[in-house]
Structure formats: structure tokens, C-alpha cells
Amino acid sequence: MRNLKLFERFKSTQVHAFTTQDSPSTSSNGSPRMMKFLGHPKSKSRSLLPHGFPTTDLLEPPLDSYLKPIDLVESLSNLYRRIESSSESEASMLYLEQYAVLRSLGDAKLLRRCLLNARRHAIDVPCKVVFSAWLRFFRREHELVGVESMDCNGLASECPKTSLTHGCDLNVDDEGCECSTVCEDEFGSDDVKISKADEFSGLDEVSDISFCVGSEKAKCVRSRIAALSRPFEAMLYGSFVESTTSEIDFSENGISIEAMLALNIYSRIKRVDLFRVETVFELLQLASKFCCDDLKSECEARLAASVTDLDKALTFVEYALEERTTLLLSACLQVFLRELPQSLHNPKVMRFFCSSEAKEQLAFLGSECVFLLYYFLSQVGMEEKLTTDTMLILLERTREFARTNWQKALSLHQMGCVLFERKDYKAAQFHFRLASSLGHVYSLAGVSRTEYKQGKRYSAYRLMNFLISNHKPHGWMYQERSLYNVGVEKLKDLATATELDPTLSFPYKYRAVMKFEQKQIKEAFQEIDRLIQFKLSPECLELRAWLYLATGDRESCLRDLRAVLSLEPNYVVFGGKMRDDLVEALTAQCIEVESEADCWVRLFDRWSAVDDVASLAVVHQMLQNDPSKNFLRFRQSLLLLRLNCQGAAMRCLRMAWNLATSEAERLVYEGWLLYDMGYVEETLTKAEEAISIQRSFEAFFLKAYALADKNLDADEISCVVQVLEEALKCPSDGLRKGQALNNLGSIYINLGMLDQAETAYKNAIEIKHIRARQGLARVYFLKNQRKEACEEMTKLIEKSCSKAAAYEKRSEYCEREKAKEDLDMATTLDPLRTYPYRYRAAVLMDDQRETEAVEELSKAIAFRPELQTLHLRAAFHEATGNLSLATQDCEAALCLDPNHTETLHLYSRSKDQASSIDNTIFGLD
């Protein structure tokens, strides 16, 4: 049902920003001088320099703070083999390693799956607690208003109660969490009086021994107390004097009479949930002293369940460390971790994690658990862009508890990155060198950068030269060397970097600024536009906004600034904090105040022209004019998804959820958030709940979207048609109805109802849903009207601002040479699209140019190792008899998707052939 998808979700990659932190011209907030500048429309670009305009001397790419294997395919292949052959106790940390390796791809769903698998295979409670909190943080649930950190959201993998049980939970996320069906407070109130325990059976047994605390007595049953542990049994039935007396003085044991009374009750009914927390603490001490294992476990569980907020966690954690009670400590850690990122800024929490005492006391959990704990904390800190002393301590703890090479290399490299941001270049260089000595070659880029920052430009250049000469070249190597090169050689390095890895932002930005400085204004815009049309980021839009402002085009500048704020509302730009009054000042100078109707007309126009950046800007303006129009935030999220800005899209959805004015509206947004995580059944449930409250277009649309994602037969697919028809009966605007009609056409195609599909697409086109031309072209093609199909796609190309997908699709309806031209154009416009590489490789393979076919696929794999491309290259290797490389590509592909049926078959076949050849050779020997 892929045809029903509205949005193409590409795997996002690391954004490379230009940094101006070393620039003396950067102002603190940018507003006073900027306001002055706004009064001069004809100002030249040079007058912008004091305001922080990026010059070529100031531009440099940031150092990536994650693992970057020198051969990612080989690393993935190796990981897959180790995961497949791992024991139950090894699997969890291998999935964590997979997460660390795949961070460079930036695929949120893939990374979440790694964490989920790690959580499923985790055995120890502390590890389960960390993974559970990590999964929760990954979804940014802390941004949802009204959701408490210790709430269960219905997902078993993130449930705070489920995490506190020992052992693997391999099916933890296949079904919803059942904890909501259990009584919320299964332990009762702390204020329950012990006297009420008389209501329980078993308490009427006659007492035959008393434990005295001062003048008070706790009457007990000798046999029941003896059954609690061997020490008690020896004391009460052994050769000790206590075995022959009916009263035992316990005054010197530091135990209160209330605790002894509680011990009596526990010995009879085996429950501790009746007692106050203070009493349970005493029972736990007594259990530790007299080796009452069952009592100790019960007390730990009771205390762990009572740790429900930060204050209690801070109170209990010291005791948990002193008594080395794993469960209670895990419960305290869980509260700290589920409060992230806020707890990173809590002095008491950070004092605990950063203290040398805690480091020593936490060690009893095992180095694996403690490494995981500090790794998670440090990753949250990296995402929060912390460069404080606390951040360095967290990374240092991560390094201290690291045991494998990848763990040590990653923590050292990240310490280098933080120290580099702090401008402590000598210390940063030391850590980068250590990381590189452990096999992390990318850390040498950090070494060369710190050399450069310390005035050793030639030394930095030589190091990168050595790297390029001794390893398979990567785009980042040439990008890094370009910083230390000059003139024509610098531009050659940048060109090579773009050729090897077109996703790198820095080369485009450098060339754009350079051309602008050389007064090649048109070429400067073309250069930055090349990047923006396939990889949208705040940094790139910011640069283009500067160019527009410098050339006096304030309207285009304002459009890009609004898009920047849509992507990142708190983005720092123009040498200081982006402020609303700057946008307002530009608005006042660009256009007259638009009415709501004018904005809708403009949004309709830009949406229809597939001008997503301009559409984002209009939606931002409409929200600024009237923030109460919450449905616009949902539209914003759709646009951001289409632009492959998944993080920003999910933030918009969370904001819409927070500001929803009705339960039905909130359920729809919650459904989309669940859908994005892959929870189709839960999404359907939310859609049904929303429909039961209020029949709305968005609720029916969500239901249809989720249904179409399931494996349905023909009868079930027809249900999707009915749901979409119900959606179209509900009030909505033309933009959304156009999308519904477009989806309806896709369903009709799947059902073989081509005439109905044609009607649906034409109706969508009538209300200016231009993307429906792609569906209409498909209908014509299926009706053997290839010429008409090609013409429809040509119309889409002519009318659309974003053309790469249209060129790619038109290639399916053209003759071979024309198809190749279209696919070449698609690659030029959007090098992230992998289908053109696969098509060209298949053509080369058909022409028996096997080496060139493999090289074509290798180009794409070098910067985007995607499943289908790896599978195809594996098939080519198999066809040419290179079975070892075929196996390696299959393993790398299966590391991305272990259930991909075709790759599994190819992998099995390649291994069988290789084994057969080995056996033949062995027989000849």
C-alpha cells in the first residue's frame, strides 16, 4: 500500500552548519544594528559584515560527534554476524553498538528499533531502566503537557513498572502494556495501621516467643521467624541460649518495636505492603543483617514502588547505594532518567552523578550497566549542546566504565568534540588522538582541526593528506583538507567532497559565499539552492536569507526566516537570538498586512506549486497572526515531513497535542505520533476513539492512512475507500480534500478500478492538488497510454517547484535514453534519491558492464547505504561470482532490516554457493 503514502521520508543526515563562534564581528543579540540596517534597502553586502555576515574565512563545518566507521558496510556486516551468533547476555549491548554505528545515518526509526531491541534483550533491571527511559526521551514525551515522567503511556517497553522486573522481555513491545489494568496503588497507603492487619487470616496462630525492644514486646511464632533465614533458624533452634527462652532482647540491634511487629506480621502472611516506608526501611536492614533473602526482596520491591518523584529518589538513592540494593537503586535512577533533560540542570541530581563517591558506589551494578547509564546521560547532554564541566565529567565517567574499543573510542571522541567547542584545543587534540589510536579514523579529522586552530596549518594539511593516501577516500576527508588548502586546490577538494558525498553542506555553503564575495550573485544563489532543494536545514536557509537581505530582497529573506523558525523556533541567527520583532520589522517593510483570506489564497497557491518552503513561511505567518489555529500546526508537520525534517515535524505534532482544545482533536494528534513510531494498531485505536467522539475529516483520514499501512486483501482494501469517502463528507479545505482524493485514487489503482482512479485524480487536480498528476500518469500508463502518462508528468515538472521526484517518476514512462536523461536530472536535483543509481546500474549490468554497474551502486552506498541498493549490489556480486562481497552486502542490508525476505534468500543462497565451492576445493586437495 505504499502508493497511499503522502510523504516521502528520506533518511535524514547530519546537518553541517557554519560556525561563527570565533568571529569578533558577531554581535550579542543582533537587534539594534539590524534595525538600523533594515532602514536601508539598497545597502551593499559589505555593509553586512559588521553584523556577522558569513565570509569564507569564517566558514567551517562542525566535527561530527558520533562514530563514523571508515567502512560502514563492513562494520554493519560484522555487527549482523555478531548479533546473530550472540548469547542472550550479549545481545543487548550489541544492539546498543548498532545504535552507535547507525547514528551517522540519522534515521530516527532505525535508531529507535535498535534501542527497542536492546531493551527487549536487556536482562538486568538497571539496564532495562536506562533503555526504557531512553526510548521515552527519544520520543520527546517530556514535551507533552500534562504527561508526568512516571506515567505509563501504554507502551510496555517504556513502562516504569515493567522495567523493574528482572529478565528478558522479547515480546515487550508487541502488545500494549497491561499495567493500566492492575490497580494503580497495589501497595496501599503508607498510613495503614498495623493493627488493621488482624483482619488477615494466619494472624490468629498462637505466639510462643517475644522479641523485646525496651519495655515493649513483639509476640511472634518461633517456627515462622526461624523459617525466614538460616541465621534465625540457628538462633531459635540451635545451640544458642535464645533457643531455650521465650523472650529475646533485641534492644541492641537498632530495630524499633514497630519493625519487630511488622516482622511478626510478615512471617505470618508474607506481605510488607501494609507498612509505612520507614518501617520497610528497617525491615530491609534487618533482612540484610539476618540474611532473610525473601524478606529483602519484598522490601526492595515495596520501596522501589514508592519512588515516584524526584524528592523521594534523592532521599532513597544514598541508602540504596549504602545497602547495595539493586532494585531500589534502579527505581531511583529511573526517576532521574525519566526527568531528562530537565534533570541535567538539577544541581542535586548532577551532584549525585558527578561525585566520585557515586562513581565508586555504582560500580557494584557492573561496568556494562554503569557505562550504559553514563552513555545515555552524555548523549542527552550532547543533544542539549552542553559544554559545561558537568558534561565533561559525564563523558569521563562514560570512558572510565567503557570496556570495548567502540565504547572507549566514542567517549574519547565526544570528549574531544566538547573540549573543541570550549576552545581547549590542546586537550581536545589529546582525546582525538586517543580515539584514533583505538581505530576510529574519523577522530584524525579532530586532530587536524585542533592543529589548525593552534596555528599549525601545514601540519593539519599533512595529516589529512596521509589519511587520504592510506584509506579509501570519503567526502569528509576532502572537505576537511579543503580547510587547510588555498586557491584552486581548495576548490578542487570541495568539488571532490561533493562528488563523493553530495550530502555534505559545507562545500555548497562555501562556494555560495565565495561567489557572493566575487559579486557573482546569481551563481551564489544557484549554489545554495542546489543544497536546499534536497536537504533543508536552518543553517542553509539562514545563509540564503542573508543573501536575499544583502541584495535587498526582503520578501524572500522574510520567507526563509519564517521557514527557519518553523524548523527551529529558538534558532540563533544573524549573530544573535532570532527575535519576533525582527520578523515583524521585515514584515512591515515587505508587504501590507494580509487578511486571513489572503494568507489562505497564498498558501493554496504555494502548496499547489509544491513550493514547500514558501508554504512553511505562510503557515508560520498565519500562526503568528492567530496562534489559536492549532490545525495549522498539523499542516506544518505535514510539510516538514515532506521536507524530510522529521524531528521538527514531530515537535509540531507535540505542540498541536499540547494546545488541542478537544479530546477528539488530541486523539488525532496522538494517533499521528504513534503512527510515526510504527504503532499501526494503536493508531487505529486512537482514530476510532476520535471518530466515536466527533466525526471529522482528520480522524477518518488518519484511520484510512493507518489501514492502508496494513497487509490487506481486496475486500479489506475496499474498506479504506469507504473511510476516505466518509472523510470527504466532513468539512475541510481544498488542500486536505485534494490529498484525500489523491489517496482515494491510489486505493482504486490497487483494486484495479482504473476509471474510478482517473476520476478521483482529476477531481483532485481540479482543486489544484498538482501532485495528483503523478497518480493520473500512473493510470494512463496502466491503460497502456504511455504518451499521455509522460505528458502528465511533464505538466507536473513544469508547475512544480520541487521537481526531482517528478523527473524520477517520468522516467518510468519514457524510452530508455529519455529515461536516463530524466534520472540524471533527478540525481542532479536530489542526489539522495537512490532509485536513479539502481536503474543506471541495472542498465549497465544488462550491457554486461558489471564493474561499472557495481561502481554506480557504490557511489550511492558511500553516502547512503540503503537497503535496496545494498541488496542490488549483493545480487550483482553473486552474478559475477564474488560471493564474499555478496555475503557482506547481504549482512549489511540485514543489519538495517533483518526481516527483508529477498535479502534473506539471497544471503542463504550466497552462503550455500560459497560453502559448495569450499567443499569442492577441499575435495580436490
Swiss-Prot record:
What the entry lists under SUPFAM superfamilies is as follows: POZ domain (SSF54695), TPR-like (SSF48452)
**Record pathway:** Protein modification; protein ubiquitination
Q: Which domain of life is it from?
A: Eukaryota
Q: Which InterPro entries match?
A: BTB/POZ_dom (IPR000210), ETO1-like (IPR044631), SKP1/BTB/POZ_sf (IPR011333), TPR-like_helical_dom_sf (IPR011990), TPR_rpt (IPR019734)
What residue ranges carry the coiled-coil annotation?
509-533
Q: List the disulfide bonds.
A: none
Tissue expression pattern: Constitutively expressed in green and etiolated seedlings.
About its domains, the entry says:
The BTB/POZ-like domain may mediate the interaction with some component of ubiquitin ligase complexes.
Subunit record text: Interacts with the C-terminal domain of ACS5.
The protein here is known as ETO1-like protein 2
